[in-house]
Amino acid sequence: MILSTERLSLIPVNEFRDVNALTDALWEIHSDTRTYSHRPDLVMKQRSEAIELRDQWTEDWQQKGRGYYAVSYQGEIVGFAGVRHYILAGDAVLNTYYRFRPGAQGKGLAYEAVKAALDASAQLGKECIAIISPDNLPSVTLARRLGFRRSPDRDVSPEDQVYVLQNPQNEATANQL
């Protein structure tokens, strides 16, 4: 299902009609060293990696009915965002992801896109996490703005810290007990 915000269209990758344009955007964003200044080792080196990622994300939508969206702003794919089913230390959770073109950063687009994706996934009732490199300060800042908080006891590695979305409704219930 396509999501719309005031400025954005979020298109599930399996519903994106122009597969070549989708692959091009994946490659351009994920091979841009500016996108991975915090972790240069993660930069895509071959276009085949973008094709593999596209196929994996398409499969997520087809098999699990949830996944990442291509984020369109003014008719251009400016990034990717959403949640997908993920197993973290044996627990089924939703992993939150966002990656945007450098020219699209700093405009509130990632916040708007991720918020829409989280809102659309709220009915699933699963815990949402974000795995973030501590050196990626813009990503940490965005996660905190969205309500995610550090959960050091669940860290994957020193390079991959876990943030958990705090649910005020659950906290209120816990405080009443």
For the regions a protein language model found, what residue spans apply to each?
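Short secondary-structure capping micro-motifs at structural edges
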Residues: 55-58, 83
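Short, conserved alpha-helical segments within structured domains
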Residues: 42-49, 67-70, 135
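Acyl-donor (CoA/ACP) binding surface of acyl/acetyltransferases
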Residues: 1-37, 68-177
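Conserved GNAT-fold acetyl-CoA-binding loop/helix
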Residues: 34-56
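A short helix-loop-beta-strand connector motif used in the catalytic cores of GNAT acetyltransferases and
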Residues: 57-69
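A generic structural signal for short
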Residues: 46, 60, 127-128
